[in-house]
């Protein structure tokens, strides 16, 4: 480059120059790279979606938002940043959600099923999990220990593409089931199988509280109890 620039600088106006040039071929061409991009399913998970219409809609909406996201090698995915704040203005509906140990209606309730399904797909893809938090209770839609709770302004779910090639998140919803796939390029024969083992259980404790709004002798369950494990 310096030689060419020097010749141009010293040339007379209108002078024709003959310059030596060497063509360097890339180690990998665009066509070669395109042929291997997203050719393999690194990991795939399917969970059954149930509940109110609002909850199902929230799961479908959040899944649609993350579908098609591409991460280059070394890039990190944030569920909260990608999905964004869950508001009614953005199409999310009130639905049951776990809040401080209680089940209450919250805008965006149910989106943890999307993050949990994604989390398990990432585990099966052998991706690097950089941030993940479990629910206080074991959700019914996924195996124990395979969930990932999220909350706007609170817990997030993050993972990093630790492969040599770009990866893509692909989601679909059909027949009451949410499917999450991680597409990428396999470079070895590594195979991931997830298992869990129950080490202990913790029985719940029944706590009674006075409530003047109820008729004498009436009982009302405030929070559905679960056995911890």
Model-derived regions, located:
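Well-ordered beta-sheet/strand-loop patches within structured domains
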Residues: 1-229
